[in-house]
Amino acid sequence: MPHETLLDNQGWFKKLARRFGPGHVVNTCFLIVMLFSTLLTWREVMILKDAYVASQRNHLGSVANVLDRQLQFNMDRLIFLRNGMHEALVAPLAFSALQSAVTQFEQRRVRHFWQLELDKRRTLPLYGVSDQFVARTTLLSRESRDLANELTATLELGYLARSSAMLTLETMYVSRSGFYLSTLPTAYGSDIVSRYYQYVTQPWFIEQSQRRNPQRGVRWFTSAQPYVADEQKKVTASLPLDHDNYWYGVLAMDIPVASLQQFLRDAAEKDIEGEYQLYDNHLRLLTDSAPEQQTENTLNDRERALLAREIEKDTLGGLRLGTHYVSWERLDHFDGVLLRVHTLREGIQGNFGSISIALTLLWGLFTAMLLISWGVIRHMVKNMFVLQNSPQWQAWHDPLTRLYNRGALFEKASRLAKRYREARQPFSVIQLDLDYFKSVNDRFGHQAGDRVLSHAAGLIGSTIRAHDIAGRVGGEEFCIVLPGATKAQALQIAERIRQRINDKEILVTKSTTLRISASMGISSAEEYGDYDFEQLQSLADKRLYYAKQSGRNRICASDATQEREKK
């Protein structure tokens, strides 16, 4: 029947309320509300975080794409020049001017330095060193059978290399055969030798050997040492020239770091938040978009190590380093990585910071209101519960000692004894009586006696275990029920109670203190296998009498005849 089900549910709720108490129910409900509100807020925070990370990547990606396109143009041009030289090596032009240049080379190759020039208006001059200079190192060689073709191909390169490339400072071809061509002119004289020597000793030339660069692709090199002035720092892209498995030389482009810095600063002007930083493949800072003399966002060694570990895993990503959020992306046409550093201050001042602050304030306001409501409702429920249950509490407890009264103690103890008998677990009882209590009433009055009883009850309650129960069963008599305690454990608890009562002094009047003692008797179900509480309490009371007869302030845990035998 529906009506019966409703009654059953009401009974179930009443049992739950009696078991846990209304305070626990209120706490649980508010805890669940707090938990769900926190989870919802946390979900919004995670969504906001993902949006912030995506925004950082979008800003970085737009700048990285533009920079990559600029660098790609230069790389495509470098590859175009190499392809042109390769075609000239395979099928050289039969121009008389080129043949004349080869003849001039044969005449001048023994000179300490020399120069070949076809047309000052349309091509670039060719500079070279002597056979003796080339023979000094195994890295250089003029033993190629296609030396004449390489020479004419380099002169043809002069027509193509004259046109400027974006961001490029210098474009050059350096041959292992002792000559070079550059978009930057060289004064005729000993500068030719020193410049060629400088070229062939650079990493971008040496590292392009077939052993060190077996892939024969573009490689990047930096000259960003601390002792190099900012205006002299540059990055170099180099590409080897090969034909029939023979390495002829290196095509290279120098890009000044100042050009890259200006590009990043132009990008930063459009993006008022964040700082862009360009690093090489060793995570050495090349340049950034920060104004002059402002380097507070530079990464330290520890942060660079953390970033390097993350970069090894993916081509782009983000990482929080202290109060900075660093998003990074590898460039496709540069052997390095571009970073966008966003500080906490910039984040707070931005749109996402405003949303985060508003979300935090809303959560804090809701939490504060929830806590205030919880306190008010819990206080109201507690008062109602106390008012509702005060007659029952008064019926079960002794008003003076706030321990169970005799009837309540016997009822609860009997139920506990039955439960522990079924579980075959130990069960013990302590009967306690305050020594010479009648003389306290006679000497100091009943008010002092009440104070002694309340004091003793407080010591008993603070000494027993959490699941033990204690009650006042007579004038100055107390009974303590110890479920789960053996006789030996009960003796230890009784001794602690006796010592605490005996050690504490009680202020019975304004100028008088009193030290009291207690005698106790102990009984346990393990002695005779009897779990009847009234029998155990009676036996403990009997042993209490033996303790008093033996001199008081002591504990008796066995029959008097056994005590005498022990003595």
Swiss-Prot record:
Instruction: List the record's Gene Ontology CC terms alphabetically.
Output: plasma membrane
Against CDD domains, the record matches this protein to: GGDEF
Annotated pathway: Glycan metabolism; bacterial cellulose biosynthesis; Purine metabolism; 3',5'-cyclic di-GMP biosynthesis
- The record lists Mg(2+) as bound by D433, E476
* Enzyme Commission no: 2.7.7.65
Single Gene Ontology MF annotation:
diguanylate cyclase activity
**What is its membrane topology?**
Multi-pass membrane protein
Q: Give the record's subunit note.
A: Homodimer.
Q: What is this protein called?
A: Probable diguanylate cyclase DgcQ
Q: Give the organism, scientific name.
A: Salmonella typhi
State the gene name recorded for this protein: dgcQ
